[in-house]
Amino acid sequence: MTTPDAFRDAEYIADVSGISYGNVANLTEQDANVVPRENERMRKLQLAAKVAFIDRLLRDLDILIYCELSALYYMDCSVILFAIRAIVQLIFFTPKAPPFDPTRNQPFIGAIFVSNIFCMIFHNFFTHPEASEATRGYLHGGLLIDFIGQKAPISLFRLFLLDFLVLILDLVMLGLIVERVKTTGQTSTTSTEILRVQDHDSEERGVHRTRPESRSSVVGAELDETDGHITRANAGVGEQAEHTQLLADPSEDGHTPGAKNSHPLDAFSSGEAVIMNLGLFDVIRDQWKYSTTAPPARTSSYIPSDQTAAFLRARFGLQVGPDGRVQRIES
């Protein structure tokens, strides 16, 4: 994660965020109604930066696993073992385009352990690479790639060590994918409340119109008047609380959104942010329970995303109907 690409992704997110240094800490009393929206905006920004770092780490680990598989193929000269794990890696772990975002519904645990245990058993009982005098004691590659230069025989301990390393990397990628799915789910949950804009008339009456809009105009007017009385009654209490907050240390106040001359992505750019607390046994247990539990009954029809709908329409001529069924577009 020390490559410039990861920090370039974070800098791009910071540029498009529109949040400058210190603008959250310098909010005045007139901007107090903007604090909840700024907090929500910063939270979404930090989640987007976390997803960007996870995607970069997944791509790096994916390349590393393919390098390990190539090294194993270089030593055991078995196309079958290389193909088994390469197919599992390509289907379940290799990052793909947005219409094919990873989900937790895939059988990650079974694919990881079955493929790796099969390769370990094959290395122990069936694979014994040997070189003849015709090749001067050196191994040649298998069916697809002809590697030359590996000295025979190959130690069984080295094969098991690389097999175990591939298994650990697969489990780390599984934990990252699960964390990415959870983070993306948090990002997609947005508030449906409609906020009304504060105007000059409401400001003169002492009424805050940033409360969610009511369905009834009569009830809304009554609530506005009530808000005005409450605001004037609690003016002294609010001033005292603001005075106490200004005198308090920023670290002692849990509601302080940010310090002066700081940015929400400073933790990511400085390398102090934790994108995942990885526990291999916890990841295996949670994913196994998630895979074995029955899926909940669908209460509403499936509505695909815009990218998925465009891909199905352009590539296969299909569309998802109101009942959730895939239908062919009749021209």
Curated annotation (Swiss-Prot):
Q: In which pathway does it act?
A: Protein modification; protein ubiquitination
Q: How does it sit in the membrane?
A: Multi-pass membrane protein
Which key words tag this protein in UniProt?
Answer: Endoplasmic reticulum, Glycoprotein, Membrane, Transmembrane, Transmembrane helix, Ubl conjugation pathway
- Glycosylation sites per record: 26
Q: Name one GO cellular component term.
A: endoplasmic reticulum membrane
Give the protein's recorded name: DSC E3 ubiquitin ligase complex subunit D
Region of interest (Disordered), residue spans = 188-225
Which compartments is it annotated to reside in?
Endoplasmic reticulum membrane
Query: Gene behind this chain?
Result: dscD
List where the protein spans the membrane. Answer: 63-83, 107-127, 159-179
Signal sequence range:
none
